């Protein structure tokens, strides 16, 4: 067995490397709907989200779509005297399962029938971080460069207005902040290290202002998803304060996570689409060692 496959159990190896199939109704995730996301058990690449999982009655985990358009590859499979469409992971080329055209019509009509043994599950509160650090274009671009981060979405959170638009949030009356939702692999990077990146990539002593952006929607904030995340943030902030790391007091707020509303599509991955766009962050810091 290759070195990067030595961590696999027998069934994980047979499924991902030899295209075996698990027994229906007797596998780990067939009836699990805990919020979170699923990674390739071989490589750790992001494959599926729990929000896209549904009960198909087939006895294997079923998803209406992959986590993003290029998360998986599909190929013709003529084994067992059948014509099917096989699903494999893009980077590790792991066999995952098959996709069929009998999924829920309201979800697009597809059913990704996936072996549990090909997946590693990360619970939402263990692999998700919500931060606000000024203009979300820059914050997104920074965290996309951090090793262990799987996906970053920009959006709005922290307020009470339902389904806000960018125009709504710009008024400063919604209570929402421009924020990022980060999915990360806790086996690669810890939440504490993400916090350290957060405090490094913006000015947490500047009240409602980052760069040229001013207003409560540009506040410095950590939106915690669990008591553990809250405690880790409080501990790190206390350590920084005690060590005099910053010349002024921290103004970062600790807020319990509320609904996160993804921003309009043109805001997503903005600085990749618009390389000359406004950025208040030194992006190179994302790849430099933490203190």
Curated annotation (Swiss-Prot):
Residues 1-124 form the MsrB domain. InterPro entries: Met_Sox_Rdtase_MsrA_dom, Met_Sox_Rdtase_MsrA_sf, Met_Sox_Rdtase_MsrB_dom, Mss4-like_sf. It holds the Pfam family PMSR. The active site is at residues 113, 135. GO terms for biological process: protein modification process. Its EC number is 1.8.4.12, 1.8.4.11. It catalyses: L-methionyl-[protein] + [thioredoxin]-disulfide + H2O = L-methionyl-(R)-S-oxide-[protein] + [thioredoxin]-dithiol; L-methionyl-[protein] + [thioredoxin]-disulfide + H2O = L-methionyl-(S)-S-oxide-[protein] + [thioredoxin]-dithiol; [thioredoxin]-disulfide + L-methionine + H2O = L-methionine (S)-S-oxide + [thioredoxin]-dithiol. Residues 127-284 are annotated as: Peptide methionine sulfoxide reductase A. It comes from the Bacteria. Keywords: Multifunctional enzyme, Oxidoreductase. GO terms for molecular function: L-methionine:thioredoxin-disulfide S-oxidoreductase activity; peptide-methionine (R)-S-oxide reductase activity; peptide-methionine (S)-S-oxide reductase activity. In the N-terminal section; belongs to the MsrB Met sulfoxide reductase family. Has an important function as a repair enzyme for proteins that have been inactivated by oxidation. Catalyzes the reversible oxidation-reduction of methionine sulfoxide in proteins to methionine. HAMAP family: MsrA. This is Peptide methionine sulfoxide reductase MsrB/MsrA.
């Amino acid at each position: 067995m290759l070195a990067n496959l030595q961590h696999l159990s027998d069934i994980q190896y047979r499924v991902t490397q030899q295209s075996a199939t698990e027994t229906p109704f007797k596998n780990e995730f067939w009836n699990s709907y805990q919020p979170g996301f699923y990674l390739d058990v071989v490589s750790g690449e992001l494959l599926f989200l729990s929000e896209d999982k549904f009960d198909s009655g087939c006895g294997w985990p079923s998803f209406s779509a992959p986590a993003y358009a290029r998360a998986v590859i599909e190929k013709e499979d003529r084994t067992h005297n059948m014509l099917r469409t096989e699903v494999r992971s893009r980077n590790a080329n792991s066999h995952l399962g098959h996709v069929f055209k009998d999924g829920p019509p309201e979800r697009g009509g597809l059913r990704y029938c996936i072996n549990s043994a090909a997946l590693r599950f990360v619970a939402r509160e263990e692999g998700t971080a919500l931060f606000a650090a000024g203009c979300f274009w820059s914050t997104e671009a920074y965290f996309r460069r951090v090793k262990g981060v799987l996906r970053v979405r920009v959006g709005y959170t922290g307020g009470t207005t339902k389904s806000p638009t960018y125009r709504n949030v710009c008024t400063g009356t919604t209570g929402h902040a421009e924020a990022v939702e980060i999915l990360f692999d806790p086996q690669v990077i810890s939440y504490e290290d993400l916090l350290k990146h957060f405090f490094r990539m913006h000015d947490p002593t500047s009240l409602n202002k980052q760069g040229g952006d001013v207003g409560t929607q540009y506040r410095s904030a950590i939106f915690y998803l669990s008591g553990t995340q809250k405690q880790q943030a409080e501990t790190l902030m206390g350590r920084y304060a005690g060590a005099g790391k910053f010349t002024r007091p921290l103004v970062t707020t600790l807020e319990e996570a509320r609904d996160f509303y993804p921003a309009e599509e043109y805001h997503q991955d903005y600085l990749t689409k618009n390389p000359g766009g406004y950025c208040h962050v030194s992006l190179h810091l994302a790849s430099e060692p933490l203190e």
